[in-house]
């Protein structure tokens, strides 16, 4: 009886999470439509389509010494990149990761940026001899800042709000570049912030440096976002003179995309309702690493309560939100042992579910597969939407298009990555697929910042 009830839960999940190619094409078309609406006017779409003010991407010919600062969570990274022009590319690079003391994450703006500038100063001071800048030229820094900002130029942006574990009230509404610049002056650090970017723009820049056919940078990690190169004359909301390059990098903020075509289940609806931002970031909640483990946990809880298939267990761990994380479901999903030993271990260690039969473990793997496959297929539909907007989804003009993807989910969850890539091929068709490539762009957010500083270099 328990097995029949359990199978009902899984069958319903399978049906509700189905992503046939026809539905995915509708999702891709909806994404392209929202992109157009967001470019039309401010607030015209749930997808913000923010101007990054980056109109020049690296070409691979840049040379000199450039710095990057990457702040997006409880750690930040500082890095130095020595570029050797088109023949040598990156001659060498060094980086250091620094933990931010917790009290600074809710202190004042000057304390946080003072600490960051101090660490940056130490990093710069430890350089070898012979790396002085020529003719008293200032050192150039690219700043990756992965929090919501409103930009008005390539090197300025006011903080809209903090996310993650930060709550520094006096920084909200302030220009984060000016705050950093002031802190660097106080440290006696002769450095100029050449560009303020986010991790998606950094991924695009880092990949473009090596390959001029890269058209978009996409993040599938804890969260998700995308940035791509748009023709400046295709942005009706652009005010002022068009850039000489004729291009503009758009930071899509596509995590907030929504369409009635998205296959949303009761588990997604409950997760959204209980989240800090109900009704927001629906696409992100279906496709990113922050949420996949949590969706699976909710399914397993229903399975336990409705069918009793796990026996008389204490459901307290199974009832704890975010207790099951995406790396756990990835480990279970990739379990290739004949008796699914890893699945048994994870269920026991994390959820205190013991004595499972092989049939039950297979059911758990199937649930992981349904949730991860839906995420990967919807992720591919988003990428197809960008290609559709750019007219690169298989028209007559089959120029090569490369999508650079970074983020832990894409990098470490093999079945997610493989499913995304094969689904993109399915949506584009055999002919168009020949001219589209997906590349893993490792560490875009760090090195990308330094490379954009180089491409903006005066």
From Swiss-Prot:
Enzymatic class: transferase
EC nos: 2.7.1.1
Annotated metabolic or biological route of this protein: Carbohydrate metabolism; hexose metabolism; Carbohydrate degradation; glycolysis; D-glyceraldehyde 3-phosphate and glycerone phosphate from D-glucose: step 1/4
GO CC annotation, single: cytosol
Residues binding ADP, per UniProt: 73-75, 222, 408
Domain Hexokinase span(s) in chain numbering: 4-454
Chemical reaction(s) catalysed: a D-hexose + ATP = a D-hexose 6-phosphate + ADP + H(+); D-fructose + ATP = D-fructose 6-phosphate + ADP + H(+); D-glucose + ATP = D-glucose 6-phosphate + ADP + H(+)
Region annotation Hexokinase large subdomain: where it falls in the sequence: 198-443
Record keywords, A-Z: ATP-binding, Glycolysis, Kinase, Nucleotide-binding, Transferase
Family: Belongs to the hexokinase family.
Protein name per Swiss-Prot or TrEMBL: Hexokinase-8
Organism (species): Oryza sativa subsp. japonica (Rice)
């Amino acid at each position: 009886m328990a097995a029949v009830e359990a199978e009902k839960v899984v069958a319903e999940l399978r049906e509700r999470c189905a992503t046939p190619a026809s539905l995915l094409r509708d999702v891709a078309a909806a994404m392209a439509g929202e992109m157009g609406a967001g470019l039309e006017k401010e607030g015209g779409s749930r997808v913000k389509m923010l101007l990054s003010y980056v109109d020049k991407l690296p070409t691979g010919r840049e040379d000199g010494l450039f710095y990057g600062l990457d702040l997006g969570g409880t750690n930040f990274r500082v890095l130095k990149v020595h570029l050797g022009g088109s023949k040598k590319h990156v001659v060498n690079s060094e980086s250091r990761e620094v933990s931010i003391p917790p009290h600074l994450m809710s202190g004042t703006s000057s304390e946080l940026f003072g600490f960051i500038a101090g660490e940056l100063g130490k990093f710069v001071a430890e350089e070898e001899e012979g790396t002085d800048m020529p003719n008293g030229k200032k050192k150039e820094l690219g700043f990756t800042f992965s929090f919501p900002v409103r930009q008005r130029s390539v090197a300025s942006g006011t903080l809209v709000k903090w996310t993650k574990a930060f709550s520094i009230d006096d920084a909200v509404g302030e220009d984060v570049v000016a705050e950093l610049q002031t802190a660097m002056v106080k440290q006696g650090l002769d450095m100029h912030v050449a560009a303020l970017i986010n991790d998606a723009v950094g991924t695009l820049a880092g990949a473009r440096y090596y390959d001029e056919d890269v058209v978009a940078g996409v993040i599938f990690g804890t969260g998700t976002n995308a940035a791509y190169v748009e023709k400046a004359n295709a942005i009706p909301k652009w005010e002022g003179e068009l850039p000489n390059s004729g291009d503009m990098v758009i930071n899509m903020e596509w995590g907030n995309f929504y369409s009635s075509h998205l296959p949303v289940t009761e588990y997604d609806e409950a997760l959204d309702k209980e989240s800090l931002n109900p009704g927001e970031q629906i696409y992100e909640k279906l496709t990113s690493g922050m949420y996949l483990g949590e969706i699976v946990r909710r399914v397993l809880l229903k399975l336990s309560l409705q069918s009793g298939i796990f026996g008389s267990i204490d459901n307290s761990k199974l009832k704890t939100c975010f207790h099951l994380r995406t790396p756990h479901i990835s480990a279970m999903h990739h379990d290739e042992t004949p008796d699914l030993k890893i699945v048994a271990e994870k269920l026991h260690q994390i959820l205190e579910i013991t004595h499972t039969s092989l049939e039950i473990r297979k059911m758990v793997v199937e649930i992981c597969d349904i949730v991860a496959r839906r995420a990967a297929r919807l992720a591919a539909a988003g990428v197809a939407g960008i290609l559709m907007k750019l007219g690169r989804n298989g028209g007559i003009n089959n120029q090569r298009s490369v999508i650079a993807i970074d983020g832990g989910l894409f990098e470490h969850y093999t079945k997610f990555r493989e499913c995304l890539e094969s689904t993109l091929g399915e949506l584009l068709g055999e002919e168009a697929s020949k001219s589209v490539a997906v590349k893993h762009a490792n560490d875009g957010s760090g090195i990308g910042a330094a490379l954009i500083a180089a491409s903006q270099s005066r």
